[in-house]
Amino acid sequence: MGLQEHPVTPAERQPPVRGGVTIGVEEEFLLVDAASGQLAPHAEAVLAEAANGPLGAPDAVLHAEMLNSQVEAATGCCRTLEELRSQLVAARTSLDRAASVAGARIVSSGTPVLAVEGTGTSNGQRFADIAERYRAVASDYHVCGCHVHVGVPDRDTAVAVVNHLRPWLPTLLAISANSPFHLGHDTGHASWRGVQQRLYPGSGVPPHFPSRDAYDREVARLVDCGALVDDRMSFWMARPSPHLPTVELRVADALITAEETVLQAALSRALVRAALDDLAAGREGDEVSDQVAAAAVWNASRYGLRGPAVDPVPARRVPALEMVERLLRRVGPALEQTGDSALVREALAHVTGVGTGSERQRAAAAAGGPREVVAMLAAATAPGRADRLRT
């Protein structure tokens, strides 16, 4: 959700590097009752239980999110995708083990499948301030995302890199789309989280900023205007970390499997590396109007990968899968540099073949109704826990 009370996480605690090497991921999860599949307000109990057991990823951190039916896992600073995957799996397994003690399961979905009842805000003054400022927007914001941090040399570079990322953020959202349901109903959208996020000020594709100072002034202005609670809170899909020299991509829905999260991280890192190469060569990022960028996000939220997309640079509609191919061409050299090309192409072929998370959720609903969706999500979220929800 991006509204954390916690201090800087290991995913953000990355040393200055040449850039585009280190990665870290924050994954948000919903807690559901193991019997009913409804959201379960057990975050405090789950985190306490998880603290008593082996995590299997010493650099990872587990903590609360804004709502008491959510938890988050932040990996440590990783240099390879295999290292990242190992930490993701370990954290998911630890959280699900702890949730089972509380009679719950973790599910990785951008929004809850079933209607929301009996949940509230987690403890903490910042959470209370956010709830008071945004009221129903915050209390109805039962969403989970996946945030990817990529190390860059400094904050000035981070702002410049984000300018180069702007045209590609909607495609990352389409690939990650995993939130078709809201309050027990099919929204008709691939990413309802993407729709709900736009209710907050300072969301969507960030504007182009000519400098770090310009970025900082704009954030300060939004805080002064009351749109943001503080300077850590912007909802833009990509931003410089408020704390350290990283670019944080906050575009993706929470992804069902660890493998899909690794794919999102790999594409994010490759886009940052491509941007760094452009900056080193003196190439400017493509110009994209804010309104066209918003249209591209809307199309990605609505259709995912099975319909039209908007190519923001010529500002025209194209098939969503065509944008995926263009993305692959954009990041191809960067993926070759890190040795990740084959993995990414295979993972993308799998997603386009079996469907995004939203498509798989709808297929499960067609086969067995909403509880079948929750069962599918619970089984796939935590590897090794293939048992279904209790009946």
From Swiss-Prot:
InterPro entries: GCL_type2/YbdK_subfam (IPR050141), GCS2 (IPR006336), Gln_synth/guanido_kin_cat_dom (IPR014746), YbdK (IPR011793). Pfam families: GCS2 (PF04107). It catalyses: L-cysteine + L-glutamate + ATP = gamma-L-glutamyl-L-cysteine + ADP + phosphate + H(+). Its EC number is 6.3.2.2. GO terms for biological process: modified amino acid biosynthetic process. Keywords: ATP-binding, Ligase, Nucleotide-binding. GO terms for molecular function: ATP binding; glutamate-cysteine ligase activity. SUPFAM superfamilies: Glutamine synthetase/guanido kinase. PANTHER family: GLUTAMATE--CYSTEINE LIGASE 2-RELATED (PTHR36510:SF1). ATP-dependent carboxylate-amine ligase which exhibits weak glutamate--cysteine ligase activity. HAMAP family: Glu_cys_ligase_2. Belongs to the glutamate--cysteine ligase type 2 family. YbdK subfamily. This is Putative glutamate--cysteine ligase 2-2.
